[in-house]
């Protein structure tokens, strides 16, 4: 059976390493090339022994021709590479934010750089399969969603599309420390992060315009007012988002749950739960668990959603997008369930 060739540009970050782990056991693809400038010349399995079956050399540049190239570079660093990859006939999935926003001016405002290839922003497909499956299938370039936006958007889209809520929402989200990347900072080292919870980037987080952009599409072009407050919590993986929105009219708890169940009934990686979900349910999986509930006294909808920020929030969703682009079963390579404890 033919195996599709894949490569990872910058394998050494958490998202790149998670990609390597998932792709190694994928039955229909072969991981052929991985890059990482600081570790070039070493073997992936030597530097990261837990990837013991991956004896690939880490190189400075992608070697050979691949069918799908995954970009796992930090924001601003990968966009300029994309035109050359596309010219070589490769399909590209970018895990950074470089192609998520459609308005090039937003990159200057939120990321502090002028986009090097704004002409590709319109072509890039926002890679949230539950909403963009048909567009992803034919795409050359997919912008993998951010971790916070994945959790928040999946939690709120059914309510916006069903016209259940006013066009505004408050999103309180809590993330494990891996969401801040592998480069250590004062706020992520053990002695600072352990037994501590803190909010950060209140009202200024870079994922906010991404959330607004996609919820706007779900609410028939009405630009929603989104208040987004992220927090760091002392765990390695996981995001739990709690979203609050005012109901347009009275609705029962069961009616809302049925709307959500129907919206996601055919989605292999979204489960509407009967009880509030835990982040540990998602650990190492591509699942998103969602719990909608009505606060009847205050006429509010509350939606809790949780994901593994490195899987459904990054590498797993990238592989899900790859499966769709290559015409493979969407769940291929992503069937793992969480471990307990």
UniProtKB/Swiss-Prot annotation:
MF term (GO), any: N-acetyl-gamma-glutamyl-phosphate reductase activity
Keyword list, A-Z: Amino-acid biosynthesis, Arginine biosynthesis, Cytoplasm, NADP, Oxidoreductase
Biological or metabolic pathway of the protein: Amino-acid biosynthesis; L-arginine biosynthesis; N(2)-acetyl-L-ornithine from L-glutamate: step 3/4
Localisation: Cytoplasm
Catalytic activity: N-acetyl-L-glutamate 5-semialdehyde + phosphate + NADP(+) = N-acetyl-L-glutamyl 5-phosphate + NADPH + H(+)
GO CC annotation terms, alphabetical: cytoplasm
SMART domains: Semialdhyde_dh
Highest taxon listed in the record's lineage: Bacteria
Enzyme class: oxidoreductase
EC code(s) of this entry: 1.2.1.38
GO biological process, one term: L-arginine biosynthetic process
Active site: 147
HAMAP family: ArgC_type1
Known role: Catalyzes the NADPH-dependent reduction of N-acetyl-5-glutamyl phosphate to yield N-acetyl-L-glutamate 5-semialdehyde.
Family of this protein: Belongs to the NAGSA dehydrogenase family. Type 1 subfamily.
Name listed for the protein in its UniProt record: N-acetyl-gamma-glutamyl-phosphate reductase
Organism: Dehalococcoides mccartyi (strain CBDB1)
Name of the gene: argC
